Amino acid sequence: MNVFLSKYVNGVDKKSRVSVPANYRAVLGKELFNGVIAYPSIRNNCIEVCGISHIEKLRQMTETLDPYSEERDAFETMIFGEAVQLSFDGEGRVILPQSLMKHAGIEEQACFVGKGVIFEIWQPQNFEKYLNAAQKIAHEKRLTLRNAH
């Protein structure tokens, strides 16, 4: 399967290393880079994570915007300018940069959340708060999904 699914909570050690769930690594197995691209989410206080192929799609999307627009500049700065390549070690761990950990409020635990073509890394309690709000929105907007095709 080529989508990121499910939710996992893993510990973060004193060196800021965290194990990426094995099934997430399996999805990334087809990528040219043995690791992930991570950047601060522009929607939530979390880290968005993807493979090189998704970053290329984001690049193509930003290139459709006016090259001198504030929007394009902001998106490119926040996504590409803040993105970091994180390589997997022999145990499937990555080292989370302090800037990303601070953005997400991550200290001792990280919550991995599959979102289809990307996954997010949250501070677990912050994700639970978000999940409660998301459940309400999903319930209220459920017909939108049915009408999407």
Swiss-Prot record:
Residues covered by the SpoVT-AbrB domain: 7-54, 83-126
Gene Ontology CC entries for this record: cytoplasm; nucleoid
CDD domains on file: MraZ_C (cd16321), MraZ_N (cd16320)
InterPro entries: MraZ (IPR003444), MraZ_C (IPR035644), MraZ_dom (IPR020603), MraZ_N (IPR035642), MraZ_sf (IPR038619), SpoVT-AbrB_dom (IPR007159), SpoVT-AbrB_sf (IPR037914)
One example GO MF annotation: transcription cis-regulatory region binding
Location in or out of the cell: Cytoplasm, Nucleoid
Family matches, as PROSITE patterns: SPOVT_ABRB
GO biological process: negative regulation of DNA-templated transcription initiation
Signal sequence coordinates: none
UniProt keyword annotations, A-Z: Cytoplasm, DNA-binding, Repeat, Transcription, Transcription regulation
Record flagged with keyword Cytoplasm: yes
Family: Belongs to the MraZ family.
HAMAP family in the cross-refs: MraZ (MF_01008)
Record note on quaternary structure: Forms oligomers.
Protein's recorded name: Transcriptional regulator MraZ
Species the sequence originates in: Rickettsia peacockii (strain Rustic)
Lineage: Bacteria, Pseudomonadati, Pseudomonadota, Alphaproteobacteria, Rickettsiales
The gene coding this protein: mraZ
